Regions:
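N-terminal targeting sequences that direct proteins away from the cytosol to non-cytosolic compartments
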Residues: 1-97, 187-210
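Conserved polar/disulfide-associated segments of primarily extracytoplasmic proteins
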Residues: 3, 12-21, 25, 49, ...
Length: 210
């Protein structure tokens, strides 16, 4: 179980992110993780090209996020996550991609509890079912997003079952006062997580959880 010590500093700038093979949804409907990697391209002089207007994405009346220019929705579907009591929690899953990178989003209406409890559920029921040799950090960071919403963030490392590739990731979890929850899962092949950290943090920081 992941836990949150009182001496963990508040850091609203921690990164997330990377790329993994096509997502596998479990037959039971377990929400899947997919991940993200930034593709490094050429250089453009600041101000030369206007930034395109990107429309916000809304999930389940719970989560609203504005993709950065170049990111687009490539997958969107209903998802369920098993709860410790044996029931299932229904929500909506979406995947944003940019080149070979991706950011997974999970919106869970009325999940209740705390962000730490939802983070523990996600680690136990989703991450462990999708990765082999998974290792999740015992300590989580309590952070405050730019909009003032409190959240928790933890890291993990594991291997992709089909290829054995080492993967590292960072998960940010928010539960609003309404009881609605949101999970932002960013990942990359080991050693590449930092490449997309800035863009992932920017999108998460500007997201709204109703």
């Amino acid at each position: 179980m992941i836990r949150s010590p009182s001496d963990v500093p508040v850091r609203p700038d921690t990164a997330a992110g990377a790329v993994r093979p096509p997502r596998r949804w479990l037959p039971t409907g377990l929400v899947a993780l997919v991940m993200s990697v930034t593709v490094l391209g050429g250089f453009v002089v600041a101000g030369t090209l206007p930034a395109p207007d990107v429309s916000p994405i809304a999930l389940g009346g719970v989560l609203t996020i504005r993709p950065l220019p170049g990111w687009e929705v490539v997958r969107r579907e209903s998802a369920t996550v098993p709860s410790p009591s044996g029931t299932v929690i229904s929500g909506e899953f979406a995947q944003l991609t940019r080149g070979s990178g991706a950011l997974d989003l999970l919106a869970l209406p009325g999940v209740g509890g705390t962000a730490l409890e939802l983070a523990d559920l996600y680690a136990a029921e989703v991450l462990t079912s999708q990765l082999e040799r998974i290792s999740v950090s015992e300590l989580v960071e309590r952070i405050v997003l730019r909009n003032g919403r409190e959240a928790v963030r933890f890291s993990y490392i594991g291997s992709e079952p089909r290829t054995g590739a080492a993967i590292e990731g960072s998960v940010t979890v928010v539960v609003a006062p309404s009881g609605n929850g949101a999970v932002f899962d960013g990942w990359a092949f080991q050693g590449q997580l930092q490449l997309i950290g800035g863009e992932l943090v920017a999108m998460i920081e500007s997201a709204e959880v109703a």
